[in-house]
Amino acid sequence: MKPAFNTQRWFGLWPGLIVALLLAVLIVGTLTAVGGASHSFSVAVTLFDPYVLQVMRFTVWQATLSTLISVILAIPVARAYARRPVFIGRGILITLMGLPVVMPVIVAVFGIVAVYGRSGLLNTVLQPAGLTIPLEIYGLTGILLAHTFFNLPLAIRLMLPAWDQVTAENWRTASTLGMSSGQLFRFVEWPAISAFLPGVVVIVFLLCFTSFAVVLTLGGGPSATTIEVAIYQALRFEFDPGQAAILALTQLFLCVCSALLLIRWLRVLTPTPGRRNDPTIRPDTATRSGKLLDFGAILVCSLFVFAPIAALVLSGLRGPLVSVILDIGLWQAAARSLGIAVTATSLAGVMAFGL
């Protein structure tokens, strides 16, 4: 018997289908129009060019390294915050962890250079003791450092809810069995983290993969160029819309493939309803070594993230602060930015609701 047409289900699907169709038409149409404006629209020549292949390899390599560093470092820091849910300033620190995400990238890069550059604050402090850190801020090292600055706090905030998935019964059972801190992480905490890890890895990887301003300012040369920067170079310096369109499509294809592979490779678990993390039911929070490790991890992470921000604030206070605040151009730019942000947020919200 032929099933009846489900009208209600269709009306529930059409908003998402319309939004998806509009996005597909916008992306494909824009790239096709840009590529059609070029007389050198050759996919094979562009994709198999040695320079383009090197750019693709470097893009994937730096995104992979940045993701591994950010996520691996985020796990112990997030665990430290989870094991110490009550201490003075905890909420403020977690809230301020969102600053790197909303900061202008170029401004943040200036702060990173001011702290970790050759003549930065870190080497200035160590110099009287005869110590220096030979950190090459321009090149792959600088890119990884900047990506970690932006994505480490994001990964921490995204993974913190994982500990709320662990039930009180699990903690009590672990306490009864006398589990060590390492056993707790392996058998109790890791299954909860695994439910959040795929999403965190995909988000951080795609942010690093499509990074533009960081690579443009800290890349240091053609050997440290990503696809995003290559697109900019093709339009700005070579004026080759065809090559830019091919590179953009290639980046889109690689992003989709990378996200699908990462989600498939990493084990995805369904989050289980737990309870708010209670320090009184964890069997590993009372030891002195555990407290030192947790607060040490929180302190080091806070210094790493907030030092560039503090350097920017101090530099701004030493500048012509009053004249900048009274500059009408500043407020016009702020109003323009606010208008664009509100419009983009509204459109994104409506489209996301439809999808």
Model-derived regions: residue spans:
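Short alpha-helical segment immediately N-terminal to, or the first helix within
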Residues: 45-46, 162-163, 187, 217-220, ...
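Glycine-rich helix-loop "coupling/hinge" segments at transmembrane-helix boundaries
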Residues: 114, 213-239
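Membrane-water interface segments at the C-terminal ends of transmembrane alpha-helices
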Residues: 7-41, 50-164, 192-219, 244-263, ...
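Alpha-helical transmembrane segments of integral membrane proteins
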Residues: 261-297
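Solenoid-repeat scaffolds in large eukaryotic assemblies
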Residues: 174, 243-244
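Short helix-to-coil transition segments within interhelical loops
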Residues: 166-193
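Cytosolic juxtamembrane amphipathic/interface segments immediately preceding
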Residues: 2-12, 51, 182, 279-286
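A short amphipathic helical element positioned immediately N-terminal to and/or at the very start
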Residues: 3-4, 41-48, 320-325
